[in-house]
Amino acid sequence: MTDSSSHSADQRRSDERRSDNIQGRLLWSPSPDHAAKTEVTSFAAYVKARTGFDWSGDFQALWRWSVDHNVDFWDHFWDWHGVIGDKGDRRIENGSAMPGARFFPDATLSYAENMLANADDRLAISAHCEDGRHVRLTRAELKDRVMRLAGWMRDRGIGRGDRVAAYIANIPEAVIAMLATSAVGGIFSSCSPDFGLGGASDRFGQIEPRLLIACDGYSYAGKTFDRMGIVRELAAAMPSVEAVLIIPFMSDTPNMSGLPAPTLFDDAQGDSPLDDFQRVGFNDPLYILYSSGTTGAPKCIVHGVGGVTLQHAKELRLHSDVTGEDRLFFFTTCGWMMWNWMVSGLMVGTPIVLYEGNPFHPGPERLWQMAAQDGITHFGVSAKYIDAVRNAGYLPRQHKDLSAMRMMMSTGSPLSAEAFEFIYDEINADLQLCSISGGTDLISCFVLGSPTQPVHAGEIQTRGLGMAVDILDEDGQPITGEQGELCCLKPFPSMPVKFWNDPGDAKYRAAYFEHFDGIWRHGDWATLTQRGGIIIHGRSDA
């Protein structure tokens, strides 16, 4: 009789040998017609008309131009995308300093204003819950609810620089709360309600929010979890909290006793909406996100309005080819930066699809059923989710019509070459698979997809435009075809504005810039391939 642990080890070795055989195999190529119609081709034509630079359809040539002329790149992208705001005269100050560089230091804009432009009857949000609830909001309905809540905030003195903390499920109210906070010039910070009291208070307690927004509970895998007790303790633990908004997500009549100035979320959307958006500086805070906290209290990472706006628009349009004709979904909670990234889809006119709950409830078909129902074109999940679907023996395209899906995105951990092959064999043979990698630290990606390049098994397609990413050896020298440290050699707009409560930027510098002086070392082992692709091997700072 074979020992089970021995069998498991044999299976792993077999999988590893198979993955080695698949690694680098060509799995998909864009047709010339497809490439010609992409957003990045439109942008490249814009650049050629203004600078004379001709990419000749070569994405890697465009990448090289974008990092050699990184300030020009971001300046041209602002204009091509049509950022709503005043760009100001200066494009950068302290241009080579890492940290210290500031893009568009004179610019003013509002993230919410950019997100809520063209408030018409087109779909904005399609939100699903594991229990079958489904809510849809048009762009006009979304803006109306945002401006009403923003008016309530304004009337209570919440404005520029004030923090709003949200202990919240992945539901439309989360998007509304975030946009209302931005509309008044505030700073939004969120975590999901599966966090316990310690996890939530360790994060929110550091930033001293004036307003706490919370849902009364959540459900997962068919079980209901009441969170009102934790909400009371959380509010009590933060003397800065002046009021609490409660979203009755699991109960129509949540018990709000013991809370400071409690109000139901819908009751805060009154008859005195905000008339106009509060524009703030390009480098003023929009979000506070958090490190994992595995080596102490979570670090509070502050991201700026302009950096998020520019970087997300770039990644959505130029790398992911998202347009107003698409449907964008990423399986995430409000405690992961992919929520912030996905929500930015509203800025490019695409409806976003939310899912709250267990992605395997009642079975592995759940998200694929939703994808078919909503006609999702851009479908994002974690690499671990893909592995779970494979291990469950579920073959999505045998059960659901996924013909609308033209891009899959995977992140959170490296996607194996075998998982690449599974996606093309069992989900859709004619889609672009984008394994992407970046993180909370930059609220975006260092390496991601290219709609005009082929997909090779086990490889991320390209480095981000405007991102001077390279792989360095232990002496800080660039290397190709060998493992090294993934680094960024030049400033970029979505670098953190700062860490909260970090005098002199000591923690900020220690986090990224001390291993190689003045260079962002990200903490990933990676290999740059000869064709410009990236293979992520795992953490180098674990």
Feature roles, as predicted:
Residues T350, I376-V381, R390-V455, A468:
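Gly/Ser/Thr-rich phosphate-binding loop
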Residues P478-T480, C487-A542:
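Conserved ATP-binding/catalytic segment of the ANL
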Residues D131, A214-F282, A392-G393:
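ANL superfamily adenylate-forming
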Residues A49-D54, A112-T138, S251-N255:
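AMP-dependent adenylate-forming
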Residues D121-L123, V244-I246, S257-Y290, A297, ...:
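Conserved pre-ATP/AMP-binding loop-to-beta segment of ANL
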Residues Q60-W65, A112, I125-L179, G196-S201, ...:
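Conserved AMP-binding/adenylate-forming core of the ANL superfamily
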Residues E208-L212, G229-V244, D326-L328, V353, ...:
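Conserved helix-loop-beta element of the AMP-binding
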Residues T309-R327, M337-T377, A392:
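Conserved AMP-binding/adenylation subdomain of ANL enzymes
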